[in-house]
Regions:
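Short, low-complexity N-terminal intrinsically disordered segments enriched in polar/charged residues
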Residues: 1-35, 39
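A solvent-exposed, acidic/Ser-Thr-rich amphipathic alpha-helical stretch
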Residues: 30-84, 90
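Detector for glycine-centered tight turns/loop "hinges" at secondary-structure junctions
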Residues: 47-49, 105, 122
Length: 134
């Protein structure tokens, strides 16, 4: 386990990135969302490892995301857990849970995930997400 001081420093680095990621996601603002990522960017979900370059995340990509979320009645998501489990000066592992909500405030689903943030090109960004969401 990392020391309390290391975890506190990692939280100062990671939480603003995760907050910005969720804000961009909820707005379906592709540019804001991408600004929180490092590329290539990876997502492991439903047994499939997805790999995206910056150029892969375009209007067609966000349209697919919007359609998929609309199909489940999604309106917004919130973080319900963010715990630093491992950290260094170049990488942070964050055990997360997020909850998806409908417009009326009812829960669509809650999913556990692991987010890996890396320090590249002078900034922290999300490099990998491993999620139990579909």
């Amino acid at each position: 386990m990392p020391s309390e001081e290391a975890v506190a420093q990692a939280r100062e680095r990671a939480i603003p990135v995760l907050d910005a990621w969720m804000t961009g996601f909820n707005a379906l603002d592709l540019q804001a969302w991408k600004a929180t990522m490092h590329f290539p960017h990876f997502r492991l979900a439903s047994g499939i490892m997805h790999r995206w370059e910056d150029a892969d995340m375009d209007d067609t990509f966000i349209a697919r995301v919007r359609t998929g979320l609309g199909n489940i009645g999604w309106h917004y998501s919130v973080w319900t857990r963010r715990e630093i489990v491992h950290c260094s000066d170049e990488k942070i592992h964050v055990d997360t849970q997020f909850t998806r909500y409908r417009e009326d405030g009812s829960v669509v689903a809650a999913h556990d995930s692991l987010y890996v943030l890396t320090y590249e090109d002078g900034r922290w960004g999300i490099k990998l997400r491993s999620s139990f969401a579909r």
